[in-house]
Amino acid sequence: MSETDSALPRGVSLRNGFAAGTLTFVLGYLVTYVWQSGTIRDSLQGYNAVIEFFGGDPIPAWQAVGWLFYNAHFVAVTYPTFGGGSVSMNLIADGNAPTLLYVVPPVLLVVAGFALARSAGVRDFDSGAIAGASVVVGYLVFAVLGLVAFRYTAGGSTMHPEYSVGVLLAGLFYPVVFGGIGGAIGATTAT
């Protein structure tokens, strides 16, 4: 056991948590992409025509799917308005995307937490919750990277997931809570 893992229950590894968190974030994005990229491409056609008319680069579908993935964590996307203000939107909450997208991150995180607890061999609720919550190590890193990767800029205008809410909800709250729940289930149902 490494020095950084010494405070963790026996068998729980931050390295495994990082790997599981990374895999879970990427898988969640890919599920969202495969499911919604065609619809998003169609929805962006009108916006992209206007943007290109004024000499800007079109919004790539992969970035807009990223916004939708953050929306599935209840993280709104901020975009500028005429007159210098900004507005936040959640495409799922606004009815522009399937509500079922809200279950993608929690389900994947519960499964990851479950797998982490089982692989660590822990058998009690607290150790399982800690093992499952260790998914935060990788998930947080990719949640922060996603905030940068899914930022779209045209001229002086920028659209992006809300930074602080993205870190707090998508990066910390979701993996700790849902990974912890999965880990607790994995530990307490082990035979």
What are these regions (language model features)?
Residues 1-27, 124-129, 187-191:
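Haloarchaeal acidic low-complexity proteome signature biased toward cell-envelope/secretome components but also
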Residues 18, 63, 80-82, 129, ...:
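Generic detector of intrinsically disordered, low-complexity, polar/charged segments
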Residues 25-99, 151-167:
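Long, glycine/tryptophan/cysteine-rich extracytoplasmic
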Residues 17-18, 96-105, 163-176:
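Alpha-helical transmembrane segments of polytopic membrane proteins
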Residues 114-191:
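Alpha-helical transmembrane segments of multi-pass integral membrane proteins
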Residues 92-116:
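Hydrophobic alpha-helical transmembrane segments
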